[in-house]
């Protein structure tokens, strides 16, 4: 009889979130050799999108957990969401503990992952935990919390985070920098960390249409419009750059979208537009750009490769990134000549970034785009990275 794998996934298709599609790909791949069950909450991300609750796939079982959801960026609601989903996932785990051989623990960060990890330890079920963002550290970025308060918060939350990493068979991280940092700060053996880049469905990026001929330089941002995306900073810098015959297109939804739309009105900008695209439309939309943009707050991009950067590079376009200068994003963009980075949270630096690309010839921008595509195909595809996770899980199940 096939061994049974339980994937606990805080987000899952049809939600248009990177982790949702990573876990879907993982479920499909594992279902070739194992019985796979996915536990997921009602789909709610991104805000503003509408979904059907009965989404399923014939290759594996999907169980919809009727738990509290709170997609808004508000701490108490998010805590309640994480706690409720994880507790109900643990109820399922307890009821089926004698049937389950392995858990992929991708619930909500901190207390959510901790609750599930404790249940796995209690029932002696091996698990892997993936880490996309570093908590509690990222809760304290771009906030005006006094230093003494940060120390108190860290002293409470760091042990919560350390528990589910220490007790996991492997911890999947998305960059060498992240693995090094977590191993050092959590005092956990570096060999426990598995570094696997986030991937995209690279099939969607095949046979992309050629960019439309235009004298206009088109800057684009495609992704969530939330407080960590710094879309307001992009708008202000683009306005100040005042590049002739240029356009800024912003695609996505999120809790800061209305504020950003109001900012555009207040600044009197007529060359900034907003839209929303499905995941399938993203490659085509991005192929229309002259330059793709991302802007991460200080401390948010120094230890990981943003998932949207993978999508940007696969699109074969140059990238302007406002990020930490000791980050993997800078290492790739400038080391592989795929784009330009500027310091984070600095409007004047981003203004200069816009102007830099405007001063390049179209041929120079196209060459950067070719470099982007070449790097992505070598390092960021599903074929390259999914198998690393699958092989790790298979090796754990073989030992059991």
Label for each model-derived stretch:
Residues 1-58, 400:
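N-terminal subdomain of nucleotide-sugar transferases
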Residues 42, 177, 198-199:
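Carbohydrate-associated surface elements
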Residues 118-122, 151-171:
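Membrane-proximal helix-turn-helix segments that form the acceptor-binding/catalytic region
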Residues 183-184, 191-195, 199-216, 230:
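Acidic anion/phosphate-binding donor-loop and adjacent secondary structure
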Residues 212-229, 235-238, 249:
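Conserved donor-binding/catalytic core segment of Leloir-type glycosyltransferases
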Residues 229, 276-285, 292-313, 318-331:
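Nucleotide-sugar-dependent
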Residues 356, 363-378:
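A short, well-ordered alpha-helix in the C-terminal region of glycosyltransferases
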């Amino acid at each position: 009889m096939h061994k049974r794998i339980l994937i606990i996934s805080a987000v899952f298709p049809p939600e248009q979130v990177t982790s949702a599609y990573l876990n879907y790909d993982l479920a499909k791949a594992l279902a070739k050799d194992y019985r796979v069950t996915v536990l997921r909450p009602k789909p709610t991300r991104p805000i503003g999108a509408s979904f059907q609750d009965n989404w399923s796939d014939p290759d594996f079982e999907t169980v919809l957990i009727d738990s509290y959801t709170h997609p808004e960026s508000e701490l108490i609601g998010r805590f309640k969401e994480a706690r409720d989903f994880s507790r109900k996932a643990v109820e399922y785990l307890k009821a089926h503990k004698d049937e389950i051989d392995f858990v992929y623990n991708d619930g909500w960060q901190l207390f959510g992952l901790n609750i599930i990890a404790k249940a796995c330890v209690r029932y002696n079920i091996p698990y892997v935990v993936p880490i996309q963002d570093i908590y509690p550290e990222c809760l304290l970025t771009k906030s005006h919390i006094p230093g003494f308060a940060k120390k108190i918060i860290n002293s409470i939350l760091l042990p919560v985070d350390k528990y589910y990493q220490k007790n996991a068979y492997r911890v999947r991280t998305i960059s060498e920098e992240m693995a090094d940092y977590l191993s050092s700060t959590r005092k956990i053996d570096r060999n426990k960390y598995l570094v696997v880049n986030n991937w995209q469905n690279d099939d969607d990026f095949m046979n992309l249409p050629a960019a439309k001929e235009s004298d206009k330089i088109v800057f684009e941002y495609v992704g969530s419009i939330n407080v960590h995306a710094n879309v307001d900073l992009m708008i202000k810098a683009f306005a100040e750059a005042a590049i002739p015959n240029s356009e800024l297109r912003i695609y996505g939804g999120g809790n800061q979208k209305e504020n950003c739309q109001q900012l555009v009105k207040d600044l009197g900008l007529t060359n900034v537009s907003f839209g929303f695209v499905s995941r399938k439309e993203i490659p085509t939309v991005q192929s229309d750009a002259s330059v793709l943009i991302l802007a991460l707050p200080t401390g948010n991009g120094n230890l990981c490769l943003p998932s949207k950067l993978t999508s940007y590079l696969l699109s074969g376009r140059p990238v302007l990134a406002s990020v930490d200068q000791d980050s993997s994003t800078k290492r790739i963009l400038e080391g592989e000549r795929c784009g330009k980075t500027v310091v984070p949270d600095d409007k004047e630096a981003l203004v200069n970034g816009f102007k830099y690309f405007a001063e390049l010839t179209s041929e120079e921008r196209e060459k950067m785009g070719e470099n982007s595509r070449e790097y992505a195909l070598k390092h960021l595809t599903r074929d390259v990275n999914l198998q690393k996770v699958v092989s790790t899980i298979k090796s754990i199940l073989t030992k059991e």
